[in-house]
Regions:
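Short hydrophobic-aromatic micro-motifs
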Residues: 20-22, 53-54, 116, 123-125, ...
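Active-site loop segments of alpha/beta catalytic cores
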Residues: 1-40, 145-413
Length: 413
């Protein structure tokens, strides 16, 4: 089997030639023997093009970098994937004004401000510019207020959406891609499709933001409180976001070249939501995107990294094929219980914590974690992966220990 065939066999709950291993990179510090020269510089930290609309990298990254990263992982037999994220635009009548304001008696940080002048009125977004020193490889705060950006949430002074009156304005910021953007995306997909076919690599298409977008737009506290105290406002906001997600997904499926549609859900776990609220606001929307993907002949994946079992019935009823990520350090039930719940219906990705086990575990602890994950979650319907990525601070010897342990146990029956 090639890597794509191995992934698809796992997603279909067939037995692959061995359990796949996948490692999402989010600034991963590659060891010297896996680096390469590109654009006159050594590529020390690895990323993914799926982040291009969400984060500001400290170093150059392109689809060509993605291709070389896949090759480097393949040299270690790791089942890397290619990832794409469709573009979008703002309404042509929207005007943007950016400025910064200095600290004052009530605010110790500089404030980065952006105002969108839309046909429905102005929409202002203000965050703190914290200027903290970050280590090599970590994403950085941009010099403007991006609409969708994880770093905005703890730094927010005025989030983009604070009341129902902002929703009409928001719609002008979530428009379809321009002809130029669409042409560029089609060219990108042509390159990705060609490389994926030549190398036998799976392609993931990240076209749906879901509740992550709501958290970026409103802040976490406002998002959760709105769901409980202003359900009509929250439902309309969800409808706006999912209409946007659906259009991006339809465009991505029309262009083609994607094996699995993925919806983000880092902010949709039981850290924030009860199963009842998830069922009320999210499950119907997830099911719509899953059904849309299935009609186009692709699989559908969802991301939730904590509280998997409490949300299991909602995930199952949403027709999800693949679930990222199962983190054993965050699950209150053992991995075998998780496997029993989803067996034969939803394939699982994860099994080892990147932030805990790979970051600070001993070689033996890593080995035991890998063996436990593969034995309890495999061999069918499972892709072993660090949850949820390899970050710049995870030591290479620990990644190497994970790979070695995986080779010991990947052929388990």
């Amino acid at each position: 089997m090639n890597s794509r065939e191995r992934w698809l066999a796992a997603i279909r709950h067939e037995k692959p030639d061995h359990v796949p291993l996948y490692s999402q990179c989010f600034g991963f510090t590659a060891p010297p023997h896996l680096r390469w020269q590109q654009g006159g510089r050594e590529v020390e930290h690895w990323y993914s093009m799926r982040h291009e609309h969400l984060h500001t990298w400290p170093e150059p990254w392109s689809v060509e970098h993605d291709f070389e990263r896949v090759r480097r992982w393949a040299s270690l037999e790791v089942d890397d994937v290619l990832e794409v994220s469709p573009p979008w635009s703002i309404h042509p009548e929207v005007r943007i004004r950016d400025w910064q304001e200095p600290p004052h008696a009530l605010e110790r940080y500089w404030q980065i401000c952006r105002e969108y002048e839309t046909p429905a009125g102005p929409l202002r977004h203000v965050v703190r510019r914290t200027d903290e020193e970050v280590g090599p490889g970590w994403v950085v705060q941009p010099d403007h207020v991006a609409l969708f950006e994880d770093l905005n949430i703890p730094r927010g002074i005025r989030h983009a959406v604070v009341s129902p009156a902002d929703l009409a304005k928001l719609r002008y910021l979530l428009h379809d891609p321009t002809p130029s953007q669409l042409a560029d995306y089609r060219e990108r997909i042509t390159q990705v499709r060609r490389f994926a076919a030549e190398q036998g690599v799976l392609v993931l298409g990240w076209s749906a933001f879901g509740l992550d977008a709501v958290a970026w737009l409103c802040g976490v506290e406002r998002t959760v409180m709105a769901a409980m105290t202003e359900p009509d406002f929250f439902q309309e906001l969800i409808d706006v976001v999912y209409a946007f997600d659906r259009r991006r997904t339809e465009m991505m499926l029309e262009v083609g070249g994607v094996d699995v549609v993925v919806q983000r859900g880092w902010y949709s776990s039981t850290d924030f939501w009860s199963p009842a609220l998830f069922q009320q606001f999210l499950t119907p929307k997830i099911r719509l995107l899953a059904d849309l993907s299935h009609q186009a002949g692709t699989r559908f994946a969802y991301v939730v990294t904590t509280g998997t079992l409490p949300m299991a019935d909602q995930i199952l009823s949403a027709n999800v094929d693949l679930l990222f990520y199962i983190d054993p350090t965050k699950e209150r039930s053992d991995l075998a219980a998780v496997k029993d719940k989803f067996r034969g219906r939803v394939a699982l990705v994860g099994g080892i914590s990147g932030a805990v086990t790979l970051y600070g575990g001993s070689r033996e602890e890593i080995r035991q974690a890998v063996h436990t994950a593969v034995r309890q979650l495999g061999p069918r319907g499972f892709i072993l992966a660090p949850v949820s990525s390899l970050t710049p601070d995870i030591p290479w010897p620990n990644v190497e220990a994970m790979i070695e342990a995986w080779r010991e146990v990947r052929d388990i029956n």
